[in-house]
């Protein structure tokens, strides 16, 4: 288990695996339920609909492959499928995080208190309701940072050759970094750390965050497992916060 005494940051793979363990801790499971329900309803329904549409979408996407790349069609077809899953998975993951943001913040707060022995501010339904405007403002900040970059990458998908080869790789790397920001931000925001300061802090552990975000992105594409990924990622990111940044940025001890 992660503890506040841990001084050496570990890999993103470690923190992601810790997330799966931490969601089962007694006393933490009840804070997992609401984020889990939001994710199951939204991601479950979204991916069921997606798989009914893939037969039409993939041929349409492959029609943009230029003649000189047709000989690579057998390789580009799975890349096209992965591209659709990446974009679709990230979009609905972002939507689910918007809806569940107050509950994800509460989960991060309670887990941090459990891992460190620190006393969090008073929480409850009234506390969550009071914090909703601030939490939603933070989600808008993340969206404003994300959208311009995402639009540029999506435009690349419509460029013959690049859209079927380079764009999926760039999108995967971008979504990995953005998912690291999304989930690590919950404990940072609980301590009122500004969004810009949070991003600067994450860059000090860039490799670990890319590993964490990449695994989160991959699991978002896997049916059944993607239903559980939201609370798992919140817990893993909170463990990373405790080890890497809490000593410098904590508002409450």
Swiss-Prot record:
Pfam families: EI24. The keyword ATP-binding does not apply. GO terms for biological process: cysteine biosynthetic process; sulfate assimilation. It comes from the Bacteria. One of its GO terms (cellular component) is plasma membrane. The chain crosses the membrane at residues 31-51, 72-92, 151-171, 222-242. Its main location: membrane. Keywords: Amino-acid biosynthesis, Cell inner membrane, Cell membrane, Cysteine biosynthesis, Membrane, Sulfate transport, Transmembrane, Transmembrane helix, Transport. InterPro entries: CysZ_sulfate_transptr, Sulfate_CysZ. GO terms for molecular function: high-affinity sulfate:proton symporter activity. It is a multi-pass membrane protein. It is found in: Cell inner membrane. Possibly involved in sulfate transport. High affinity, high specificity proton-dependent sulfate transporter, which mediates sulfate uptake. Provides the sulfur source for the cysteine synthesis pathway. Belongs to the CysZ family. NCBIfam families: PRK04949.1. This is Sulfate transporter CysZ.
């Amino acid at each position: 288990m992660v503890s506040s005494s841990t001084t050496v940051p570990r890999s993103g793979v470690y923190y992601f695996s810790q997330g799966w363990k931490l969601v089962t801790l007694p006393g933490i499971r009840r804070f997992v339920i609401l984020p889990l329900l939001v994710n199951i309803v939204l991601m479950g329904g979204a991916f069921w609909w997606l798989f009914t549409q893939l037969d039409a979408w993939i041929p349409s996407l492959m029609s943009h492959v230029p003649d000189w790349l047709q000989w690579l069609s057998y390789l580009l077809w799975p890349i096209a499928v992965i591209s659709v899953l990446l974009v679709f998975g990230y979009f609905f993951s972002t939507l689910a995080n918007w809806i569940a943001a107050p509950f994800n913040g509460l989960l991060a707060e309670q887990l941090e208190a459990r891992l460190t022995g620190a006393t969090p501010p008073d929480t409850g339904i009234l506390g969550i309701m009071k914090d909703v405007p601030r939490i939603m403002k933070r989600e808008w900040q993340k969206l404003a940072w994300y959208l311009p970059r995402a639009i540029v990458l999506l435009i690349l998908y419509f460029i013959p050759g690049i859209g079927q080869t380079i764009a999926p790789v760039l999108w995967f790397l971008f979504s990995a970094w953005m998912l690291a920001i999304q989930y690590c931000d919950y404990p940072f925001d609980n301590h009122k750390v500004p969004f810009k300061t949070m991003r600067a802090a994450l860059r000090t552990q860039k490799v670990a965050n890319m590993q964490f975000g990449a695994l989160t992105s991959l699991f978002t594409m896997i049916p059944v497992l993607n239903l559980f990924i939201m609370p798992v990622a919140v817990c893993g990111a909170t463990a990373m916060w405790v080890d890497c940044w809490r000593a410098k940025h904590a508002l409450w001890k």
